[in-house]
Design a protein with these regions (language model features):
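Amphipathic alpha-helical interface elements
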Residues: 1-203, 208-218, 223-266
Length: 266
């Protein structure tokens, strides 16, 4: 049986001195740190399902529109095939069938059939779709003076041009219900979706890498998810709220009072 001293050391072993200090109340109470850590665990569990739903809806909506465009142009096969015709070069910067096939093959439940298009789509990363849309408002309008930073800025600008072209020709139709200018402000429809998808991606990374969630604005990140789903189909946003909004609100209410206030980044 572990001794009382062994049991007392568990929080330090689990979280480390710095993490304990960041979670504890103003008195540095160990029990308060463990309670805060449990809230973080609950936050991950509560946010995971909505974030997963957003990923599934996003990839299916984009795949559907690219597939429609592909077939409307009478291209052979599917857009995830290795040989993209010259007329479809707009997709080349974003399509990586060899890597997708390797990932899908590893996770295929049955090894007795070849990997198909649906398998590839199901096993893509969230970043695949985020990178197709881009996030234009994240790119500084003014080029930096330092050469290394300027090279990165130029590469980001070029990539964003490719995203803008893909959006203009195909992806815009995956989000037919983006709010009008009066609601979304001065940003473009692509920027509206891109900013939200990028924040959802950052949220996923924080959850999966076990980063600190105490400063996260839970309400705003859930709102990002809802707004992306609603832009695809308003019924998705309504269904999400009916399934998860009360749990999200309860999570916010249950946040320990001594934790840092939210850092709201819209």
């Amino acid at each position: 049986m572990p001794s009382e001293q062994d049991i007392a050391s568990i929080p330090h072993t689990l979280l480390g001195k710095q993490r304990l200090a960041s979670l504890a109340d103003e008195n540095g109470d160990i029990d308060s740190a463990l309670l805060a850590f449990q809230w973080e665990m609950d936050a991950r569990r509560t946010l995971l399902a909505p974030a997963g739903i957003a990923e599934i809806a996003l990839r299916n909506a984009i795949d559907q529109e690219i597939s429609n465009w592909w077939h409307n142009n009478s291209f052979p096969g599917t857009w995830t095939d290795k040989n993209i015709p010259p007329e479809a070069t707009i997709l080349k910067p974003f399509v990586h069938p060899t890597g997708w096939e390797k990932r899908a093959s590893k996770n295929l439940s049955s090894k007795n059939r070849p990997v198909n298009h649906c398998d590839l789509i199901a096993h893509t990363s969230f970043g695949t779709w985020k990178n197709m849309i881009g996030n234009p408002i994240a790119i500084n309008k003014n080029p930096p003076t330092e050469k290394k930073k300027l090279d990165s800025w130029n590469a980001a600008k070029q990539r964003d041009k490719e995203c803008a072209l893909l959006w203009k020709n195909i992806l815009f139709s995956a989000f037919p219900n983006i709010p009008g200018r009066a609601q979304r402000g001065k940003i473009s429809p692509r920027a509206y979706i891109g900013a939200r998808v990028s924040r959802i991606a950052a949220l996923r990374n924080r959850m999966f890498h076990w980063d600190n969630l105490t400063a996260l604005d839970i309400k705003m990140r859930y709102r990002d998810i809802n707004e992306v789903l609603s832009a695809i189909n308003p019924l998705l946003g309504t269904w999400l709220d009916s399934s998860y909004e009360s749990e999200i609100n309860q999570l916010i209410d249950d946040k320990p009072s001594w934790l840092k206030p939210y850092l709201s980044k819209k």
